[in-house]
């Protein structure tokens, strides 16, 4: 990556301290946070709300149904128990939908290229990661946007590899420098795989591309059997075009992914007030109904094939019709969808942590933090779009990945919650300090015992005093993040082209 010149502030050890912290991380058994923290304490819907939404979902599937499935999908779902109405829309009786829910593989594992990065999607276990199809990269220094390229995807993957609180990497940008759709899909996938060993999410343009994709995956995994044993990518599949229509080409891609052993994210991305009802409750009902129809589709082909129920409804600013990914309503939508999917005991994914702000600034901070923590507290398994995304999904910032890693650490600490037991209630420590000690807990054995196991310390966020901040020439977080981006990429393996030349056989 070319270093972008930025206005520098004189620092006093901050960057060196961050390097030392990365070089000597805490052991996993001491870390206060990590992937798979258990959420579910935030419940925006009451039990009666859930029942009413559930009733509407089954009514929508049975009476309205979905249109435009490919012939192969229609045949498979009819055989599973769906039926075609007089209007030629595919309808789903409640018992058929519940059968699909029962057939769905629960507690799935999304594998990394190494076991360290495996994600176990048990009920309410929370993981944060990237996603998106931004066509621009944010130039934070010049306050400009430029078209995103394959190298940017690789750079983002390399950064994600080193961020403890970014647990998976779904392609966040489009390689606009690759015009041919097949070449773009293959180069995007390889840029991701080259940059990180964490689980990867990608999309594919056409069904016929899955064969060369599979050949690449088999080579990287060391054979088809090893790939199928530990599939380390998933297909983000927009199988539905809201409202209540199958996306024919995406469905054909999904069918091929199932045959190839690729886990599928069933993605319903309606926009409230445009392609979904303006009311939040109606949008939740429609999105969940669409995803449940997708579960019928998948299980009619291969019962138990690993898939994630991806309710991704977005919010519109109804004054303009533009998307508003950083709104409070977006946080509510994602959290409520998580609650509904938990009600059905399904592996869940939704989008949160986006912002409408164009740059990493105060607006982006409150937009990202408020929505990301709500999704985590609600127990969403996979929180997509939670790092780096700006401008309502139109721009992606590498510096924001660094800042958001700190933010997500605080979100995960909130998700973890408070342990209350005889040890944490600290009666003996209080008694000792008050009756025998100096009247404070600084340096107390109990304080030292929990300072690393209960508290999360950010990497680049500034917690210095105003005096120290002034003496350090008033550092700004965007400059610290930019330095961190350069550090991450300076000590990174070769570019995707170099890696491909060294790894891939000449016959590939």
Predicted regions and their residues:
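Glycine-rich, N-terminal phosphate-binding loop and its surrounding beta-alpha-beta segment
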Residues: 71-140
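C-terminal catalytic subdomain
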Residues: 358-453
């Amino acid at each position: 990556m070319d270093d972008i010149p930025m206005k520098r502030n004189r620092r006093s050890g901050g960057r060196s301290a961050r390097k030392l912290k990365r070089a000597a991380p805490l052991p996993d058994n001491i870390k206060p946070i990590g992937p798979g923290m258990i959420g579910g304490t935030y419940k925006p819907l009451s039990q009666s709300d859930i029942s009413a939404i559930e009733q509407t979902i089954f009514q929508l599937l049975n009476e309205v149904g979905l249109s435009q499935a490919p012939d192969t999908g229609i045949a498979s779902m009819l055989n599973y128990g769906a039926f075609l109405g007089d209007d030629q829309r595919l309808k789903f009786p409640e018992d058929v939908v519940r059968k699909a829910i029962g057939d769905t593989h629960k507690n799935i594992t999304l594998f990394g290229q190494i076991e360290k990065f495996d994600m176990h999607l048990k009920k309410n276990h929370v993981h944060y990661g990237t996603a998106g199809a931004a066509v621009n990269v944010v130039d934070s220094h010049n306050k400009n946007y430029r078209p995103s390229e394959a190298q940017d995807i690789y750079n983002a993957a390399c950064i994600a590899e080193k961020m403890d609180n970014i647990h998976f990497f779904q392609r966040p940008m489009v390689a606009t420098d690759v015009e041919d759709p097949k070449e773009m899909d293959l180069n995007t996938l390889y840029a991701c795989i080259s940059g990180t060993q964490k689980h990867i999410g990608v999309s594919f343009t056409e069904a016929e591309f899955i064969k060369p994709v599979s050949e690449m995956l088999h080579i990287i995994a060391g054979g088809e059997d090893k790939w199928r044993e530990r599939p380390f990518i998933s297909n983000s599949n927009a199988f539905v075009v809201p409202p209540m229509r199958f996306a024919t080409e995406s469905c054909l891609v999904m069918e091929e992914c199932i045959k190839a052993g690729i886990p599928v994210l069933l993605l319903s991305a309606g926009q409230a007030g445009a392609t979904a009802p303006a009311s939040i409750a109606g949008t939740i009902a429609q999105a969940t109904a669409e995803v449940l129809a997708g579960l019928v589709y998948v299980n009619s082909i291969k019962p138990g094939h690993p898939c994630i129920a991806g309710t991704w409804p977005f919010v519109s600013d109804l004054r303009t019709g533009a998307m508003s990914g950083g709104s409070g309503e977006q946080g509510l939508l994602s959290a409520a969808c998580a609650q509904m999917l938990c009600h059905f005991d399904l592996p869940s994914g939704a989008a949160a942590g986006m912002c409408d702000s164009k740059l990493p600034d105060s607006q982006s901070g409150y937009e990202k933090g408020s929505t990301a923590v709500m999704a985590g507290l609600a127990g969403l398994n996979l929180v997509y779009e939670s790092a780096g995304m700006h401008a309502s999904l139109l721009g992606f910032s590498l510096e924001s990945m660094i800042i958001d890693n700190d933010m997500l650490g605080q979100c995960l600490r909130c998700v973890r919650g408070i342990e209350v037991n005889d040890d944490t209630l600290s009666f003996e420590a209080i008694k000792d300090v008050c009756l025998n000690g100096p009247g404070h807990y600084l340096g107390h054995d109990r304080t030292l015992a929990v300072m690393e196991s209960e508290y999360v310390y950010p990497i680049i966020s500034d917690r210095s005093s105003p005096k120290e901040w002034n003496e350090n020439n008033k550092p700004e977080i965007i400059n610290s993040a930019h330095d961190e981006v350069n550090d991450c990429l300076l000590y990174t393996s070769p570019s995707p082209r170099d890696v491909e030349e060294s790894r891939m056989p000449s016959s590939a």
